[in-house]
Regions:
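N-terminal beta-strand motif that seeds the catalytic metal site of vicinal oxygen chelate
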Residues: 1-18, 40-42, 84-91, 140-151
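Vicinal oxygen chelate
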Residues: 1-2, 89, 98-151
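Residues that flank catalytic or metal-binding motifs in active/ligand-binding sites
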Residues: 5, 44, 53-55, 83-85, ...
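Core segments of cupin and vicinal oxygen chelate
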Residues: 12-57, 103, 120
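Short, well-ordered beta-strand micro-motif
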Residues: 47-49, 61, 90, 128-130
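Active-site/binding-pocket entry motifs
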Residues: 54, 65-66, 145
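Conserved beta-strand in the GNAT
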Residues: 57-58, 138
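Helix-adjacent hinge/juxtasegments
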Residues: 58-62, 68-87
Length: 151
C-alpha cells in the first residue's frame, strides 16, 4: 500500500456562500460536485477543484456535523489551533495573489517576501493572509524541493 497524495482538505465555513466565493473568485477553484446529507446535518457541501485539477477542498456549511480536530469555536477570539497550521497554494505570483485576496476580504498576515531557507539555500517567495472565513492561507511561488533531496 502506498500513499498517492493528499486527497483533500475539509473546511467548515462560517458563511458558506462568502467562503465559496473567495475560493472560486480569488483562487479560481471550480465546484466539481455539490451535495447535502441530512443524516450529518449537511445543508450544503461541495468539492472544489483547483485550476490544475490536482488539489481539492471539501467545503461544508456551518451546521454540518463533521469529524474535526478540537471543539468548534463559538467566537473568533476563541479559536485555538491544533496540528493544522495553514493551507499553502502554489501561485504564479505571490504578491499579485496576496493583493487580490486582500481586495476580496482577506486580512494581511505576512506581506509578500523572499526567504532563503537552509543550505544549500532555497529561495521561497510567499505571502500569507487570513481568509474571510478565518483559515490562514499561504501563497507560494514554485519551489524545487527535490533539489535538496538529491544532494
Amino acid at each position: 500500500v502506498s500513499i498517492k497524495g493528499l486527497a483533500h482538505v475539509a473546511i467548515q465555513a462560517k458563511d458558506y456562500q462568502a467562503t465559496l466565493a473567495f475560493y472560486t473568485e480569488v483562487l479560481e477553484f471550480k465546484v466539481a460536485h455539490h451535495w447535502s446529507l441530512p443524516a450529518f446535518k449537511i445543508n450544503e457541501a461541495c468539492m472544489l477543484l483547483s485550476p490544475d485539477q490536482r488539489t481539492c477542498i471539501e467545503l461544508f456549511d456551518d451546521e454540518a456535523v463533521i469529524a474535526a480536530q478540537g471543539k468548534k469555536a463559538k467566537r473568533e477570539e476563541d479559536v485555538a489551533h491544533g496540528a493544522l497550521l495553514h493551507l499553502a497554494f502554489y501561485v504564479d505570483n505571490a504578491r499579485e495573489t496576496y493583493q487580490k485576496a486582500l481586495a476580496h476580504g482577506a486580512k494581511a498576515c505576512i506581506e509578500p517576501d523572499q526567504l532563503s531557507l537552509g543550505e544549500p539555500p532555497l529561495i521561497v517567495r510567499n505571502a500569507l493572509v487570513h481568509s474571510p472565513n478565518g483559515e490562514i492561507i499561504e501563497f507560494i511561488e514554485e519551489v524545487d524541493w527535490t533539489r535538496s533531496a538529491e544532494g
